[in-house]
Each structure stands twice: as C-alpha cells, then as structure tokens.
A protein has these predicted regions:
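Hydrophobic beta-strand scaffold residues
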Residues: 82-84, 114
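Conserved N-terminal subdomain of the carbohydrate kinase-like
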Residues: 1-54
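Charged helix-capping and loop-helix junction motifs
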Residues: 65-71, 96-104, 126-134
Length: 169
C-alpha cells in the first residue's frame, strides 16, 4: 500500500438491496486503485496466497490495466488461480470496443470468471450471445464460470457441465 498524492480518492458505492427497480450509485472519478503500477505487482509474494481475485474495473484505465495483467502473470508463475469478476461499468472506459477487447483477454487469462448475463453479452458483442461466450470460455481452458442471471438464478459451467440454480430469497 502506498499513499497517492493529488486528486485520487477512495471510491464510494451505494446500493439498494431490492430486486425490482434496483438503484445504485458509484463514484469512481479519480479512484486511487487506477494508479497501481506494474512494478508494484512484482513486490507481492504471491506464494503467500491461495488465489488472486480481481474485478474488471481495474482494467478500465492505465497504469492499473497493465499492473493487473502483470499480477495475472505473477499469480500464474506462483501456481495460484486467477479469479476474475467481470464487473463491467461502461462509464469507466474510453470506449466499448476497448472494454470488450480487454475484458475478453482478462477472461481468457483467468481460471474462474464471475459475471452476469449482460456482462458476458457485452464481451460477446451481443447480449443474446452471452451464454455462448461463457460456454466458450469454460470449454477453452478448463475454466469455472459463474453466469449470473439476476432473479432467474445462475448457471455454473465447468468441464462441459452446466448446473442451474435459482435465487435464494
């Protein structure tokens, strides 16, 4: 952990916990986590951990994008799995094209991916193709995928198997 000078700050998120008419407010402008540098990822002793867990928000800008991909390499070198929560937030990215390309790469370099139907659809370039994108990622690399569908439940994909579960109110 290091202090960052200037206008960088800790992010704020406010969520409602209701299924219908869900609202959220996330303030990410100038977030400090976007300032993590690749060289800082080399200072971590990955062998002390069981997994590397990250969210898609850190890929939206530099230098945190390169830093996170460096962390992926270092985790793989230490023999620990990479767990990736897609967490696509369009307002954080310079363009949808860059976001789709970068998040798809992150998915391909991960061992476990968690995302909702909209996020996988976004990565596929078409909402209707989201489940197929999740299936492709699961089958091309022995990945565990959690494909969330809101009040429709979720599908867990692994080793050409699919397990459907409903929500737990």
């Amino acid at each position: 952990v290091r202090a960052v000078a200037g206008e960088f700050r800790t992010s704020l998120a406010i969520y409602e916990s209701c299924i219908t008419d869900f609202q959220n407010v996330i303030y990410r402008n100038g977030a400090a986590d976007f300032e993590v540098k690749p060289s800082e990822m080399d200072k971590v002793d990955y062998s002390r951990f069981s997994a590397l867990i990250t969210a898609g928000t850190v890929f939206a800008g530099q230098p945190s994008r390169d830093a996170t991909f460096r962390a992926f390499q270092n985790a793989r070198g230490a023999g620990i799995p990479v767990i990736f929560d897609i967490d696509y937030r369009p307002y954080s990215w310079p363009s949808a094209e860059i976001a789709s390309e970068v998040l798809s790469r992150a998915g391909e370099e991960s061992d476990m991916i968690v995302g909702n139907d909209e996020e996988f659809g976004f990565m596929a370039g078409d909402f209707k193709k989201g489940l197929n994108k999740a299936r492709d990622l699961a089958s091309s690399g022995n990945r565990l995928i959690i494909y969330k569908m809101g009040e429709e439940g979720a599908i867990t994909l692994y080793n050409n198997e699919e397990i459907r579960t409903s929500i737990f109110p």
